[in-house]
Amino acid sequence: MANLKEIRDRIVSVKNTRKITEAMRLVAAAKVRRAQDQVLKSRPFADKLARVLENIQSRVQFEAVDSPLLSKRDVKTISLVCITADRGLCGGYNTNIIKKVEIRYAELIKQGYEPNLILVGKKAIGYFQNRKDRYIIKTTFKELEQVPTAKDSEGITSEVLAEFLSENADRVEIIYTKFITLVSCAPVVQTLLPLDPQGIADENDEIFRLTTKDSKLLVEKSNIEKSDSEKLPSDIVFEQSPDQLLDSLLPLYLQNQVLRALQESAASELACRMTAMNNASDNAKELASTLNLTYNKARQAAITQEILEVVGGSAV
């Protein structure tokens, strides 16, 4: 059994570690709130844009419009946009998304396609750059804002558009972590290009708000309120041709899709970090309790031994 000083030092170390993990949990909880607020602030524009596209689609058949972002061609090369975090300490968040990318990459090769990667986040960059013999990396993005903004999505969108319009990629897919609840998230694959505008917000999307009660974090859940679709007047006349309208609106739509993926990934990362730090704090508390029990037993054994030595000495 370890001596009393070693056990006492371990108890102090575990308690200090618990203070750190508890602080990180609270910071992550605050940032989850910010990420949620950012999603709510960006949603009205995204929803309005979707409504406009739906109205234009009702007036103009997209199939008859000659837009490169809508055109489907024979697929040979596919670009995969992979979104991970720049940092760790967030449970299985990075591992799960990387595993999803590996599975999707292998599936595409098996189907006869030529996939390549557009990496977002230091964790994905570090992992796949160490495996360059197995994966083709086109571009990398790192050190984005912790709460993604339109500026962050602009660079990724420009790269995706350049790849698709230059026909270096016949299809572009994005792999990110969908925010489901504060304790649940899942990697998903979504096709970015060619576009198929059918609305931005999922009808099943829900908003999760963090609240506090008795010094504990609680979660409130509510469904997103869908705004009523505003129909364009039937006698409206477009000054621009449908091609010109869509050439202006579709890149905005694409950028919003990328921004939404970034925001959901950020919220998922923070939720995973909060959960991981909460588990670490609980484990540290349990370990400290076990060490205290061990310390008390060792101290009791030492005192008993001293008493026996005193009694034995006096008997002699």
From Swiss-Prot:
Its main location: membrane. HAMAP family: ATP_synth_gamma_bact. It comes from Prochlorococcus marinus (strain MIT 9312). CDD domains: F1-ATPase_gamma. Pfam families: ATP-synt. Produces ATP from ADP in the presence of a proton gradient across the membrane. The gamma chain is believed to be important in regulating ATPase activity and the flow of protons through the CF(0) complex. Belongs to the ATPase gamma chain family. F-type ATPases have 2 components, CF(1) - the catalytic core - and CF(0) - the membrane proton channel. CF(1) has five subunits: alpha(3), beta(3), gamma(1), delta(1), epsilon(1). CF(0) has three main subunits: a, b and c. Coiled coil: none annotated. GO terms for cellular component: plasma membrane-derived thylakoid membrane; proton-transporting ATP synthase complex. GO terms for molecular function: ATP binding; proton-transporting ATP synthase activity, rotational mechanism. It is a peripheral membrane protein. This is ATP synthase gamma chain. Keywords: ATP synthesis, CF(1), Hydrogen ion transport, Ion transport, Membrane, Thylakoid, Transport. It is found in: Cellular thylakoid membrane. The gene is atpG. InterPro entries: ATP_synth_F1_ATPase_gsu, ATP_synth_F1_gsu. It comes from the Bacteria.
